[in-house]
Regions:
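Short intrinsically disordered, low-complexity coil segments enriched in acidic
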Residues: 1, 126-127, 193
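ATP-binding N-terminal substructure of ATP-dependent carboxylate-amine bond-forming enzymes
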Residues: 1-123
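Short histidine/acidic/glycine/proline-rich micro-motifs that form metal-
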Residues: 20, 62-63, 127-132, 157
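Histidine-centered beta-alpha loop that forms part of the nucleotide-sugar donor binding/catalytic region
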Residues: 89, 127, 181
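Active-site nucleotide/adenylate-binding loops and adjacent lid/helix of ATP-dependent enzymes
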Residues: 103, 130-193
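General beta-strand structural signal in soluble alpha/beta enzymes
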Residues: 123-124, 178
Length: 193
């Protein structure tokens, strides 16, 4: 049985409130008159912005997808959350996967207003936009084709190995920098000398 909502304001769940963007997201929700629930992997007393939310929860790591999704569902139900605002790539990736698993495969690019498992709106880009943004090669091609900005030239490692094997790799300009196509920040970055 669902309990009645005591506070009639819309409620936003802001994740990763210890991240760089949290302060501005919280301030924006506050300007809109929202009740704000925050969560982070660290205890509230370690997170400065926890003082700026109405309620703060300690979240499991998003890399533990099952625990993280169960946590979000529990908080959304308990706090009557209307909007979920994920702030880190890893959280967006987990929610994207969950959203895809919950959608009808024939309607892959359709995003409904409310994400049924949470009974809340996921405040994140659509499926195709996230796919584009999370793939460095696709994003480079997208930007280059439209002349939107200069990008750092990149090639797939397998393509480089195949093209340069006959020359003993002497035609390459070293050091090479390699990164996973879906990496974030500098995770997985390596220099080849």
């Amino acid at each position: 049985m669902e309990m009645a909502r005591e506070d009639e304001r819309k409620t936003a769940l802001v994740t990763a409130i210890g991240s760089f963007s949290a302060r501005e997201v919280i301030a924006g929700c506050r300007r809109e008159g929202m009740r704000i629930i925050g969560c982070d992997i660290y205890p509230a007393e370690w997170v400065a912005d926890s003082a700026d939310v109405d309620v703060c929860y300690r979240a499991p790591y998003a890399t533990d997808e099952t625990a993280y999704c169960a946590f979000l569902a529990e908080v959304c139900e308990k706090e009557h959350v209307d909007f979920v605002l994920p702030l880190t790539d890893v959280e967006v990736d987990v929610l994207q996967k969950w959203r895809m698993e919950s959608m009808d495969a024939t309607k892959e690019s359709e995003v409904t207003a409310e994400f049924a498992p949470l009974h809340a709106v996921l405040c994140m880009s659509g499926v195709e936009t996230i796919r584009l943004c999370r793939d460095k090669e696709k994003m480079q091609n997208f930007l280059s084709e439209r002349g939107l900005c200069r990008t750092i030239p990149g090639r797939e490692l397998a393509e480089v190995v195949e093209a340069e094997a006959g020359s003993g790799y002497e035609n390459l300009s070293y050091p090479l920098v390699i990164k996973p196509v879906d990496g974030r920040s500098s995770q997985g970055l390596a220099r080849v000398k």
